[in-house]
Amino acid sequence: LIREDRRHLNTSSDSEVLLNVLASELQRFGAQRASASDIFAALSAVYRRVRGGYAVVVLIMGHGVLGFRDPNGIRPLVIGTRDGARGREYMLASESVALDQAGYKLLRDVAPGEAVFVDEQGRMHSQQCAAATHHTPCIFEYVYFARPDSIIDNISVYKARLRMGELLAEKIKRER
């Protein structure tokens, strides 16, 4: 990143690295007044360069808000909507309960490798920017990280925890 893109990193944060790669790719596309398709093309290049689990929401000043999820779906990302004073409004979050708390309704999960861009006019654009691979969500989202009242990838966290407990109890009974 330092040699190829001439970017200086201020921290050891993986988020800073990922966002610098995105900024470099946007710059490479010469996206002064980037369209949704320019942003999706830049993001496709980011997906080719970056490995790992992530769900990112970033404000691109003067353009809009971009949210994207890793191709394996390791980290969750959802989009919600509500009617506002200026029309339909969108919100991106890692958990459905964040939408609930802010008065939004869950629209859908952002698919692994998909990007959602809401432009300054409030229009939502979405595109599959990386080929989705084998969907491998992080088990700790269901076991520990997520709130029990969340829904991730159409799965109730509460019900998933109950089912895991039932399966664990069955296993313990068999081993006795």
Short names for language-model regions:
Residues 1-112, 117-176:
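Conserved short alpha-helical segments that host acidic/polar catalytic motifs at enzyme active sites
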